[in-house]
Regions:
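Catalytic-site microenvironment of enzymes
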Residues: 1-167
Length: 167
């Protein structure tokens, strides 16, 4: 059984004893846990991760996957790579809106819908910046939620699809 989440007033921080936590390089931020007040709570916690939104994340390198395995798909970081930006800046829409702003908007809407449906929600990011790299986000989600939804848009026309990874 993994160590319990570090919970303080609804905030969950990276516990350094969790598996793979030692590979995180940006981890001074915290996720926020919301408990559903719906009439029929599900007893399930969904982690909602608004992709991107870590100032300085693009200049720090971490492993592509917390367990050190290489990427199997291409994209911004090519297939076979074992390191990448801790949190990339994401793409920019034609109107100049950054991906991080759109994913944050989507995450807030999804949070409200999940809470109303009886799910507890762990929000990785609720503002323009959270100091949690992709490894910290994944490790927190794996230890403090039942499932992890990472919201992203892609800026290329290849390598599209839904990808699932469990560590």
């Amino acid at each position: 059984m993994p160590p319990q989440a570090c919970v303080d007033s609804g905030e969950i921080t990276l516990n350094p004893s969790w598996k793979y936590a030692e590979f995180s390089k940006i981890n001074s931020g915290a996720a926020v846990l919301y408990r559903s007040e719906a009439a029929s709570p599900k007893g399930i916690t969904v982690c909602v991760n608004a992709g991107h939104g870590t100032k300085g994340g693009a200049s720090v390198k971490t492993q592509c996957h917390p367990d050190g395995t290489p990427k199997v798909t291409g994209g911004t970081t090519g297939a076979g790579a074992t390191s990448a930006a801790a949190v990339s800046g994401g793409m920019t829409f034609a109107d100049g809106t950054p991906e991080s702003k759109v994913t944050l908007s989507m995450a807030k809407i999804l949070k409200d819908k999940l809470l109303a449906a009886g799910y507890d929600v762990l929000m990785i990011r609720e503002s323009d910046d959270v100091q949690l790299d992709n490894i910290a986000r994944t490790v927190i989600a794996n230890n403090a939620s039942d499932c992890h939804i990472a919201l992203h848009w892609d800026s290329t026309t290849n390598n599209k699809g839904a990808f699932y990874m469990s560590v």
